Amino acid sequence: MRFSRLISALLVSACFSSSFVRPLYAADNIAIKSFPIAQFKVGSDEADFGSFRFMGGLELTSENDLVGAISGIRFFANRQDFIGVTDTGLWYKGQLLRDQNDSPSAVTDFQMAPIQNKNGMSSGSKWEFDAEGIALKGDKVFVSF
């Protein structure tokens, strides 16, 4: 049963590549407040975990009810621009700003838009567009549901 679900997810992902879906049509900017997270573990300055280093994080809030339920995020090569999907059938994009130590400091130019099928239709039904993950390959965007 798990294997058939995986195959179904992969097929759906292939159908929703950027050649069929245009996620980044014009959308209004959404105000995002960013609060830096300086420590991985409260009360500890430990930043190295094996070969990984915690560079910082952000707590993001917004007065816009659409913001939330983030399922996946991917950064482009410039490490600033990002794109992602939500559990509620939305795309989002924005830019991550970094401080002088290269730690995340804020999110700007944040926009959201409905995920659309190959016919340009979005859905008000969560189960049809409940995105769980996102991957980039060249100019294609793959979404898992």
In which residue ranges do the predicted regions lie?
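Sequence/structural signature of beta-propeller domains
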Residues: R2-R5, C15-F145
